[in-house]
Design a protein with these regions (language model features):
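Extended alpha-helical targeting/anchoring segments
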Residues: 1-275
């Protein structure tokens, strides 16, 4: 069973401390995560196959590196570049999936009507527009999808799509530099939010909130944000999950959101044990 890491500070207390900085005008939002650990090392390939079955997502990856193995099923694009068109697809706003189709629709409607979630989402859309604006041809930044619902195995998300024409004198590396790390994994303003994250999260994030993908010789790029990702190292599995903290965030609600986001990997682990 995944358990909150004993090294982590109590999540609800960190939410309260983060809100103090918001009230002081220090930040608008910070994405605070916590680590969940599984004191065993499942077969990474079986975990990957279980993830594909339980939580099929736009980005599925199995990466065996020197000391660690990453197994991920990420729903979120970090940044994409295809034939000169740059795209961000921020996710902000989460609800658990309903047990019935009717309950699922009710939860989706509730998410779309939640003023707190909408305000948080629009702020991150603006952050994404600003990031792209630094590398875009003048006047080409546009929001093509705004606050639509995407459903996954255990949660549903509110998602938008932002795109632009990349300036002709720039390339994929310039685009990555302008947009990384994703605002949906840091908060706003980015730098100050990251400073507070470094203070409140007692352990390094590791791969969480980074990016996995490719940059091709043709100049195209497609990177996923490393969320819903298990990191297996030294006979221990770790997965991080976070929530965006704003002025009216409820500490208990945000804590439950992190658990809901970690559930897909928990279910994959259970499937391995049953097989």
């Amino acid at each position: 069973v995944l358990k909150v890491s004993p090294q982590a500070l109590p999540y609800q207390e960190v939410v309260k401390k983060t809100k103090e900085h918001i009230y002081q005008g220090d930040i608008i939002q910070a994405v605070i995560s916590q680590p969940f650990v599984y004191e065993s090392s499942p077969d990474p390939w079986l975990l990957y196959r279980a993830q594909r079955y339980i939580n099929p997502s736009p980005y599925l990856y199995f990466m065996k590196l020197d000391d660690i193995t990453l197994v991920g099923s990420s729903p979120e694009t970090m940044v994409r570049l295809e034939n000169g068109i740059a795209t961000l697809r921020p996710i902000a706003g989460t609800r658990p999936r309903g047990k019935t189709e009717k309950q699922d629709r009710t939860l989706a409607d509730e998410l779309l009507k939640d003023e707190k979630e909408k305000a948080e989402h629009l702020m991150l859309v603006d952050l994404g527009r600003n990031d792209l604006g630094r590398v875009a041809e003048t006047g080409t930044v546009q929001v093509t999808d705004l606050m639509i619902i995407e459903r996954y195995s255990h949660v549903m998300h509110m998602v938008s799509n932002i795109c632009c024409d990349l300036r002709s004198d720039l390339n994929a590396w310039d685009l990555l530099k302008a947009t990384f790390p994703a605002g949906t994994l840091t908060g706003a303003p980015k730098v100050r939010a990251m400073e507070l994250i470094s203070r409140f999260e007692t352990e390094p994030r590791g791969p969480y909130g980074g990016a996995v993908g490719y940059i091709s010789f043709s100049g195209n790029m497609d990177l996923a944000i490393t969320i819903r990702t298990a990191c297996i190292e030294k006979n221990c599995l770790t997965v991080r999950a976070g929530a965006g903290i704003v002025a009216d965030s409820d500490p208990d609600t945000e804590y439950v959101e992190t658990i809901n986001k970690a559930m897909a990997i928990q279910k994959a682990l259970e499937l391995i044990q049953q097989s």
